[in-house]
Each structure stands twice: as C-alpha cells, then as structure tokens.
Amino acid sequence: MGRTRRRNSGTLSNVTTDGLAPPAIESVSGELVGYSLPELPAHLVYPLDVFADAFTREIERGRKAASHIHAHVVGLARDCDRALVNNLAAMDSLRTMFGEMTLHIEENDSRDRTKEILADYSSSRPWATVNCKDLGRIHRGSEFAGQRTVELAEYRTACQASVPDGADLVIVFDFDAKGGFSPVGVAHGIHLLAAERHCACVASVSLIRSRVAQWDGTTTTMLDQWIHYDAWALRLNSWFDDYRAGMGSWKHQWIPPVGSPFVPVCSAFGGMAIYRAGAYRAGRYTGEDCEHVKFHQTLPGRIYLNPSMRVVMDW
C-alpha cells in the first residue's frame, strides 16, 4: 500500500504503513507473475486510533534497533512459485531495514518453477543460500500431526544449521504465503524484542479468506470472511491441543487489532516469527504435535503473539 489512509468513522488511524505482497521483480520471475493481493478490510491492516500514537513510536524504535542488527531469515518452500516471486522481492526490500541480513531457504520435491526461481535468486545474491532436494516425498498438505510434521521438523532443523555465528535475530517465514507479510509488523516485533529482555519469540497473526457461517437469529448465511489462519500452532495458556480435540476452532474468529498489546502465549507462529538467535539455536523441532509447538516447548524465554505482525496466507 505505502500510502496514508483516510480516517474511517474516527476508528482507524491514518498511520502510513508499508504494504503486503510487493510487486514481482523481473530478475527473479522472468515471465512468471506473482499473486495480486485483494483489498483487505482497513481494520485488518491499520491500527485503531486508540493505538495509533504508540504504534508509530514503536515502529520507529524497531526500525532504529534493526539498523544495528544482523537478521538471518530462514524458511521452507515447496511448489509455491507464484508466492515465491513476491516474497523474494519482499526479502530484497526487507534487507534495507537491517544493518545486515542473510537468508536461507530449504526446498524439496517441487514440480513447478520453485527450484528454478530459488537458483536464479541466490545466484545473484551472495547473502542468500538455498538447499534444494529431491526426496521423492508426497505433499501432505491436509495432514495434522504425523509424517507431515515429522518431515517439517526435519526441514526446520536444517534451517537451524544455517544460522551464522554473528546473527542477532532469526526470522522464520513460510514462503508459500500468497499475500506476503507486513514490513511494518517486522519492525514492530523487533521493538518488542529490544524492549523485553525475557522475550525469545514474537509471532504473527496469519489471515486467510474463507467461507464462514453467519447466524442472524433466524437463518444461516455463508459469507466470505477473513479469519485467523494458524489456529493449530496457537496455544494460549497451556500446551493442550484444543484444536484437534474439537475445541479450538474459535481461534479462527479471534483477530486482535493491529497496534493492540502483545499477547503472552505458550506457542504461536502465524507464517512468520522472530526469534533471538540464541533461543532459536537452543530449540528442538520434533513432529509429535505441530512442529512449532514442540519447538516452543524447548525454547528458553517468553513467547508473544504480536497483533501488528500480519501474514496473508491465502484467499
């Protein structure tokens, strides 16, 4: 977006924010065109007036801190070429926020142009590395805990090995997010890590547009609605897997406003999380549950959900 928004009935601030999903860049994509992010409701992007002044101050503090930081970005990519086009362009932009930024991506078994895009991108950027493998594994997209999470834990452990000695922070990002992430949210998350010395991780609110039943007292109507996506990794005040127990679907409806206070949690991810490098190295991924949950159980330090960190997964 990169623009100043007009006030809407006095509820939303006119804070200028950076947009999600920057345009695709020709040097990465060739003729491949990335996704065009649909218009998001303003309340999902901009802070309410009550949070606006503090939000602006915290972003600037985060940017100032980031300018002295070495951030290492890691992530997974498989069969996500169009999302990858936008997200790699976003990495080029994000890199300007930091004193230094490096990048490593683990890929396996892609059948689209993902491998080609990664190879082209890393060949012209010495600060970026990729590890592409053909393991002959099927894509287990709809599975919960099981072989899928065992394999994801394996790939994420490989990402841990890529962290350079000089890194201060590690940003874990899922490169298949079709709508990308908010750079302002990253700055806001860095503010929290700089301000709270016991904080080991800040996680995002991820969004997806889905058909949702709405009840008006007499009839049920199915409507398109933006909801909170990563409910399984989100464990609020215990490690109990309420989602697979049939008690956690309410979390899809919980989207705390941008600029609102950080929420202490046992676990959260949301497509992007920022870790202190030492804490990230110390954690251990396993696959008996959501791999992020198992990792966070071994993490030294506190974990917060940051309502100002936004990732758009799909629509």
Question: Which residues does each PLM region occupy?
Answer:
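N-proximal low-complexity "stem/linker" segments adjacent to membrane-targeting elements
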Residues: 10-90
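C-terminal catalytic/acceptor-binding lobe
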Residues: 14, 19-37, 250-315
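A conserved acidic beta->alpha catalytic loop
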Residues: 80-81, 106-117, 135-137, 175-177
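Phosphate/oxyanion-binding active-site loops and adjacent basic polyanion-contact surfaces
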Residues: 80-84, 148-156, 288-292
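Short, acidic, metal-binding catalytic loop of nucleotide-sugar glycosyltransferases
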Residues: 90-100
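Active-site-proximal specificity loops/subdomain of glycosyltransferases
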Residues: 123-166
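Short beta-strand-to-loop acidic/aromatic patch adjacent to the donor-nucleotide binding site
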Residues: 166-180
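Conserved catalytic core of nucleotide-sugar-dependent glycosyltransferases
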Residues: 178-274, 281-283
